[in-house]
Structure formats: C-alpha cells, structure tokens
Amino acid sequence: MKETIISSMEKFIQKFFEELYLILFDYALKIAQNPIDELLIFGSIAIAYTVIYISGLFFARKINLPYIRKILEIGISVIFYFLVSLLEGKFPQVESLLLLKTLFLVQTIRVFILSLEAFQAFGFTTKLLINIFSILGGISFFIIKLSPFTRRKI
C-alpha cells in the first residue's frame, strides 16, 4: 500500500512539473523580448527542473536530507548571485553565450545528481561526492565569473 502511494505521488509530481515546464516554455516564447527576460524565464525553468529531480530522488529514498539541503543551498546561491548581478547592472549586454553556459551548468548539475548512485556503487561516500562537486562547482563559478562575456564592460 505504501509503495502504491509513493508511486502515485511520484507520477503526480512528474506530470505536474512536465505541465509547468510546458507553460513556462510557452510563456518564454511569448514575452522574451530581450535577453534579461530570457535569462529570468530560463532560470525559472531550471528551478522547476531542479525541484523535479530533488523530488524524484527524495521519494525514491536514494539520498538523505543533508544532501537535499546542500543542493538547495547551491541552487539558492546561484539564483541569489544572478539576482544581485542584475540589480547591480552587471549585465549591460547579456550575450547568448551566457545563456548557453547557464543551461550547460544546469545540465551538468543534473548529470551529477543522476550519477550519484553510480558513484556510490564504486564506494564513494555521499560526503566525499558533495565535496568533489562543491569544488567543481566553485571552479565552474570562477570560470564563468572571469569570462569576458560575464565581466562588467569598462
């Protein structure tokens, strides 16, 4: 009975976020008049996908709560960074390459989350993987930060 309830909840969550993604994508096509709109809307889609994967992993009981908290901290940090950068006017001209980098980073995070179980099969602990991914994330952040497309133009 418990397995049926969890399975039903997983299906409901997956369907809900598939619909949310379609609505967001349709909305993006209608109102994205400039790159800032695109960045914000694709950011929303990325957040929706992050929630899908966190929910799926949580209901599948593949990870523990501290790992979910770490994912949320990273996600909130990235969102906060983009919002502060927008408010400070650090994106006077958003290049399409920045969007590609952002989407690539989201895809990379998704691959890391999905491959967690495979890494654990080879004997890696969750704590070690979090540290490795945090270091890689930090390196990626500085590469993006130092990129000529994301630096403030003087």
From Swiss-Prot:
Its main location: membrane. Keywords: Cell membrane, Membrane, Transmembrane, Transmembrane helix. It comes from the Bacteria. One of its GO terms (cellular component) is plasma membrane. It is found in: Cell membrane. It is a multi-pass membrane protein. The chain crosses the membrane at residues 39-61, 65-87, 94-113, 128-150. This is Uncharacterized protein aq_1012. The lineage of its organism: Bacteria, Pseudomonadati, Aquificota, Aquificia, Aquificales.
